């Protein structure tokens, strides 16, 4: 495997995995808060 498709020293698949995980976490927390009435009060 070559590092031609990387930005700096971080592989794009690693960046995508981290960003995707954080995005899913934020969405999960949003729906969790909305389900328990915390998000709807904002």
Curated annotation (Swiss-Prot):
Q: Which GO terms describe its cellular component?
A: chloroplast thylakoid membrane; photosystem II reaction center
Q: Which domain of life is it from?
A: Eukaryota
What Gene3D superfamilies does this protein map onto? 6.10.250.2070
Keyword ATP-binding included in the entry's annotation:
no
Alphabetized, the UniProt keywords read:
Chloroplast, Membrane, Photosynthesis, Photosystem II, Plastid, Reaction center, Thylakoid, Transmembrane, Transmembrane helix
Pfam family of the protein (one): PsbJ
**TM spans (from-to):** 10-30
Tell me the InterPro entries matching this sequence. PSII_PsbJ, PSII_PsbJ_sf
Please classify the protein's predominant subcellular localization into one broad category.
Answer: plastid
Q: Where in the cell is it found?
A: Plastid, Chloroplast thylakoid membrane
Provide the topology term for how it sits in the membrane.
Single-pass membrane protein
A biological process from GO:
photosynthesis
- Is this entry keyworded Methyltransferase? no
Q: What does this protein do?
A: One of the components of the core complex of photosystem II (PSII). PSII is a light-driven water:plastoquinone oxidoreductase that uses light energy to abstract electrons from H(2)O, generating O(2) and a proton gradient subsequently used for ATP formation. It consists of a core antenna complex that captures photons, and an electron transfer chain that converts photonic excitation into a charge separation.
What PANTHER family does the record point to? PHOTOSYSTEM II REACTION CENTER PROTEIN J
Could you describe the subunit structure of this protein?
Answer: PSII is composed of 1 copy each of membrane proteins PsbA, PsbB, PsbC, PsbD, PsbE, PsbF, PsbH, PsbI, PsbJ, PsbK, PsbL, PsbM, PsbT, PsbX, PsbY, PsbZ, Psb30/Ycf12, at least 3 peripheral proteins of the oxygen-evolving complex and a large number of cofactors. It forms dimeric complexes.
Q: Which family does it belong to?
A: Belongs to the PsbJ family.
- The protein depicted here goes by the name Photosystem II reaction center protein J
Q: Gene encoding this polypeptide? A: psbJ
């Amino acid at each position: 495997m070559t590092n031609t498709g990387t930005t700096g020293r971080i592989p794009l698949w690693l960046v995508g995995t981290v960003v995707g995980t954080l995005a899913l976490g934020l969405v999960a927390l949003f729906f969790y808060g909305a389900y328990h009435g915390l998000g709807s009060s904002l």
